[in-house]
Curated annotation (Swiss-Prot):
Pfam families: GIDA. It comes from Rhodopseudomonas palustris (strain BisB18). This is Methylenetetrahydrofolate--tRNA-(uracil-5-)-methyltransferase TrmFO. SUPFAM superfamilies: FAD/NAD(P)-binding domain. FAD binds at residues 13-18. It catalyses: uridine(54) in tRNA + (6R)-5,10-methylene-5,6,7,8-tetrahydrofolate + NADH + H(+) = 5-methyluridine(54) in tRNA + (6S)-5,6,7,8-tetrahydrofolate + NAD(+); uridine(54) in tRNA + (6R)-5,10-methylene-5,6,7,8-tetrahydrofolate + NADPH + H(+) = 5-methyluridine(54) in tRNA + (6S)-5,6,7,8-tetrahydrofolate + NADP(+). Keywords: Cytoplasm, FAD, Flavoprotein, Methyltransferase, NAD, NADP, Transferase, tRNA processing. Residues 425-446 are annotated as: Disordered. The keyword NAD applies. The keyword NAD applies. It is found in: Cytoplasm. Its EC number is 2.1.1.74.
């Protein structure tokens, strides 16, 4: 039995993030109590009492560290001794270039490793309110299906608008894939908001024929069904899926997110667009733009097809496609500090999907970082954040401050995000020529840029590990 509350970290939630956090803390020599409410209280989605149970897909997505941001995240986590990645590698099933796992074997491996660790105590039972005040170091990683009593307690502590119970996600496009020979920068009525200059949006014009074809495609496109535990997820008028708006009438979108008023196309100022799609800057780096009002339940293939019919987005590269799911997540940029601590009560640290990351690997990676921070704090050691040039640092930066909220974005403009190269700081000297000396163009230029970002990330992570976590460097 673990009895020292001062040097003990309590981790609440035995999913991917909580399991990874507990492992990292214990591996750093700090005692852990891992609290998991299953099987005493099950969720609508879980079917076992196993830790790190995968409730949806069994895929961890691409394992290509050189060309894919999530593959890079895999590599970084392996360098840091991730339990989740170790269990995934040991239970891999064939999936081409992706890392997919035997879900039961994966969960069993994580559960066994945590149960057998001498510094980890597993307690089964629901936490029905905020952690007791004598728990000095806490990581809350209860995920998208956080129990109602705990969610209510967190909301009471942080404020009414601090916690969301569903996500309404609009697609996000890489800025450099937008055709600016068609699109232009302008805010509606040239309005200047905080930090803006009156030209803060990218605008894509449509003719009547293009608009009517677009609306028809939205209505006829294949939609994703709600999962069983999402069937009562409410639609709010401020976050209606765009295809639902289209179904309400042919002109609904023209009087909603696609209204053409207050905007003039400088490329053809005498012609009034019939409708306009606006994209708003999504990150401080200015590398990502979201389609305003385009939250959707369309299937991903349909989104790519339909949204690339928008003038200026014919070759759009999507950093994230849209969706609407049941979820529980914080308005993290406002509520959490750079070490994932709750500003209102710093003994509480959050991790995983609750912080506003999306995806198995992303959740586990934030659990990893939260675990490292919690262990360092329990040992009275200062830990520098991972470099923003790494996948871990880029994702952490987005959660804790990289997102921007414009004056008209609404109180819930922060939405969950997968890791993607758009979150990374730009290269100081992007590659311009290939190994053969020829000038890089088109897809070759994009591939070279991604590979350069990955190489920089891994080199910078090695330096950070050597300086801050010498034990991990020795193990690697």
């Amino acid at each position: 039995m673990i009895t020292d509350p001062l040097k003990t970290v309590h981790v609440v939630g035995g999913g991917l993030a909580g399991s990874e956090a507990a492992w990292q803390i214990a591996q750093a020599g700090v005692r852990v109590v891992l609290h998991e409410m299953r099987p005493a209280r099950m969720t609508e989605a879980h079917r076992t009492e196993g830790l790190a149970e995968l409730v949806c897909s069994n895929s961890f997505r691409s394992d290509d560290a050189a060309n894919n941001a999530v593959g890079l995240l895999h590599a970084e986590m392996r360098k840091l001794g991730s339990l989740v990645m170790r269990a995934a590698d040991a239970n891999q099933v064939p999936a081409g270039g992706a890392l997919a796992v035997d879900r039961d074997g994966f969960s069993a491996a994580v559960t066994k490793a945590l149960a057998e660790h001498p510094l980890i105590e597993l307690q089964r039972g629901e936490l029905d309110g905020l952690p007791p005040s004598d728990w000095g170091h806490v990581v809350i990683a209860t995920g998208p299906l956080t129990s109602a009593p705990l969610a209510s307690a967190i909301q009471a502590l942080t404020g009414e608008d601090s916690l969301a119970f569903f996500d309404a996600i609009a697609p996000i496009v890489h800025r450099d894939s937008i055709d600016m020979s068609v699109a232009w920068f302008q805010s509606r009525y040239d309005k200047v908001g905080p930090g803006g200059n009156g030209a803060d949006y990218i605008n894509c014009p449509m003719t009547r024929e293009q608009y009517e074809g677009f609306v028809a495609a939205l209505i006829s496109g294949d939609k994703v069904d709600f999962k069983d535990w999402e069937t009562n997820t409410p639609y709010f008028d401020g976050c209606l899926p765009i295809e639902v708006m289209a179904e309400r009438g042919a002109e609904t979108l023209r009087f909603g997110p696609m209204k053409p008023v207050g905007l003039t196309n400088p490329k053809d100022p005498t012609v009034k667009p019939y409708a306009i799609v606006q994209l708003r800057q999504d990150n401080k780096l200015g590398t990502l733009y979201n389609l305003v009002g385009f939250q959707t339940k369309l299937k991903h293939g349909e989104q790519s097809r339909i949204f690339r019919s928008i003038p200026g987005l014919e070759n759009a590269e999507f950093a994230r496609l849209g969706g609407l799911h049941r979820n529980t997540f914080l308005n993290s940029p406002k509520l959490l500090d750079q070490q994932l601590r709750l500003r209102a009560e710093p003994r509480l640290r959050f991790a995983g999907q609750m912080t506003g990351c999306e995806g198995y690997v992303e959740s586990a990676s934030i659990g990893l970082i939260a675990g490292l921070y919690a262990a360092a704090e329990a040992r009275d050691i200062a830990l520098a954040p991972p470099p923003s040039t790494t996948a871990l640092g880029a994702l952490l930066g987005h959660i804790t401050g990289g997102h921007i909220e414009t004056i008209d974005a609404g109180p819930r403009s922060f939405q969950p995000m997968n890791v993607n190269f758009g979150l990374f700081p730009p290269l100081e000297s992007p590659p311009t020529h290939g190994a053969d000396g020829k000038k890089l163009r088109g897809p070759d230029k994009t591939v070279a840029k991604k590979q350069a970002l990955s190489a920089r990330a891994l080199a910078d992570l090695d330096g950070w590990i050597a300086e801050n976590l010498p034990g991990a460097a020795a193990a690697a």
